[in-house]
Curated annotation (Swiss-Prot):
SUPFAM superfamilies per record: ImmE5-like (SSF143469)
Organism annotation: Burkholderia pseudomallei (Pseudomonas pseudomallei)
Protein name, per record: Immunity protein CdiI
Summary of the function given for this chain in its UniProt record: Immunity protein component of a toxin-immunity protein module, which functions as a cellular contact-dependent growth inhibition (CDI) system. CDI modules allow bacteria to communicate with and inhibit the growth of closely related neighboring bacteria in a contact-dependent fashion. Neutralizes the toxic activity of cognate toxin CdiA (C-terminal 282 residue CT fragment) upon expression in E.coli. Does not inhibit toxic activity of CdiA from other strains of B.pseudomallei.
Subunit-structure text: Specifically interacts with cognate toxin CdiA, which inhibits the toxin.
């Protein structure tokens, strides 16, 4: 199954099973779950880009970008970073309803 670029995904499972980093558009709840579960998959959230969903389509917003840490990092540092990423999505979810998560492996790009 390929990632549908014209769809907003509501499940973090889809992100991990399809390799959604950088391209998958996620609902706020799914993006929060991705951030919270990323460490379990050996990933660190390096960037989140938020926007507004127009069915279909993603309007990226320059006022909704969060930059995390770049790998390589250890697991503890990644977990702290990923929790901060989840908090960012929570704080932006009233104004923005779709998010793109960039999450490389903690060992490096």
């Amino acid at each position: 199954m390929n990632i549908d670029l014209q769809r907003r995904y509501d499940s973090s499972d889809d992100f991990f099973s399809l390799g959604g980093s950088v391209v998958m558009k996620l609902s706020a709840d799914a993006a929060i779950a991705v951030c919270e579960r990323a460490g379990q998959h050996g990933l660190v959230v390096a960037r989140i880009e938020g926007g507004i969903w127009h069915f279909p389509g993603f309007e990226a917003r320059l006022d909704c970008i969060w930059d995390g840490i770049d790998p390589p990092v250890d697991v503890g540092v990644a977990e702290q970073n990923n929790l901060a990423a989840a908090e960012f999505v929570r704080s932006e979810s009233q104004e923005h309803d779709v998010f793109v998560v960039t999450a490389p492996e903690i060992t490096g790009w």
